[in-house]
Amino acid sequence: MARRRLVTGPPDFVGVGAQRCGTTWWFRTLLRHRRIVAPHGRQKELHFFDRFSAQPMRDEDVEAYHALFQRRPRQLAGEWTPRYMFDPATPPLLRRAAPETKLIVMLRDPIERLRSGFAHRVARVPQGSKEFNAIDAIERGRFATQLERLYRSFEPERVLVLQYERCRRDGVGEYQRTLRFLGLPDHRRPKRLERARGTTTTGRKLALWPDMDEALHAALDPEVGRLRDLVPDLDLALWPNFAHLG
């Protein structure tokens, strides 16, 4: 019997955020489903739209994006570039390239996300703590601002917002919830999922800077308060740094 021909077209889903929130783990989890495929070479992050900060996106660029997503009939193809939600220019470009796509967002306690980024930087760069850009790290944790911006390009019902902490606690349930959002059957219900790696610090929590806690809450408490309104099922009990807002 002849093999079914591969087809190309806009991605069926795109993960757009957020950095240091377990997105690599969750993308790999999704790829366990026989009907979900990654771009050629199983690459997770395409960063396709980054280039258009310096040049306009043309129709041929849109076609080139579509060509990256090859799948057989009934398969779903997608990518996950966590920077897309953070970059203000990307959501309108993504809307133009894939107006019918479904978006997935994975969020995490913003202070723990910052701490994870700090640990990642320290591990990779000598004297990394001195080079860590705290202002940029705080901006990347302004999830309400980013989600509001995303909703200006995509209807909220096209966006699934997950909590990293909930996915760790109830991985099977959140995996099935994600499949339902994508319109897929549950496949073989896994008894457990692979544990998340690379998103937590080991041992005691890394210290940041003296008196930084107050500055972080001043910047991020209002964001989390607005995020609670944008995501009604957000469970702040899973974010101890912000449980006082619940």
Give the residues covered by each predicted segment.
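ATP-dependent NMP and nucleoside kinases share a basic, alpha-helical "lid"
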Residues: 87-105, 144-145, 151
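N-terminal hydrophobic signal/anchor transmembrane helix of membrane proteins
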Residues: 98-118, 140, 194-208
